[in-house]
Amino acid sequence: MNTLNKTLLSVSVALGLNACANVQTAKTYDLDFSKQKYTEQSIEVNGQAVKFRAYENVVYVRNPVDTRYEIINIYVPEAYYNGGEIDGFTAETAPIFLPNQIGGYMPAEPGKPALESKRGEPEDGQKSPNAALTALSKGYVVASPGARGRTESTGKAPAAIVDLKAAVRYLKANDKAMPGDAEKIISNGTSAGGAMSALLGATADQKDYENHLKALGAAEGSDKVFAVSAYCPITDLDHADMAYEWQFNGVNDYKKMNISMLDYRVKRE
């Protein structure tokens, strides 16, 4: 093969790869909430059936980088579609519980309401409602966003907080189209997720993120939340590293431990 043909082949391959990359990211999404795309679900909590509509895997930006994570699961108590009330809340007044599943600043898919085994107990033992299911049973609308994270090339900072802000903007943009009061969004997370939840509250409408949000095609408007629920938020990473060094000083033996991504069950192998 002569030099010209080799050059043409290289250019063709490069163009082909570029075209494939564009196919993966070229699709744009509508940010209007679709009321008809749901499933009806019911889970028993304390002897009572908690019935709700599940709107899952909803892309919350027009130009997502990764649709594995830039999606949100929305759950609405069925009573709100029949003019009902739960603990004094209605379709117009119900707060929106926004729990993220972020751990270790890694990518996180949206969460779901479920009955789960308590930490340290066997899988076949007694199960309790998780936070999302508990919130539903109390009349909250639940919206659990996914977010990109540090183990992916597309998840470097500030990707995670930008994704959470975009999810909040999606809910506010669709406030009139869905049950729940988007002025009463309560963000929730644990550990790194708690840190991201705290950051979401502290950086409300911060202009430094605007270009990132525009690049994703996030809905315009505010990303302010009403309240933050942050469990053991790990925010001061430099001092945390020093604390680990102090705590484990002189500990030189290591045994591998596997920790599952969402339920943090420790398994020594």
Locations of regions flagged by a protein language model:
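Loop/turn elements at helix/coil->beta-strand transitions in domains of secreted/extracellular proteins
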Residues: 92-96, 138-143, 182-184, 223-227
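Alpha/beta-hydrolase active-site loop
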Residues: 155-177
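C-terminal motif of bacterial Sec signal peptides marking the signal peptidase cleavage site
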Residues: 18-19
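Bacterial N-terminal signal peptides that target proteins for export
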Residues: 1-9
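Short beta-strand element of the alpha/beta-hydrolase
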Residues: 72, 87-105, 109
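Catalytic-loop region of hydrolases
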Residues: 23-90
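Cap/lid segment of the alpha/beta-hydrolase catalytic domain
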Residues: 99-162, 203
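Primarily recognizes the serine-hydrolase "nucleophile elbow" in alpha/beta-hydrolase
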Residues: 173-250
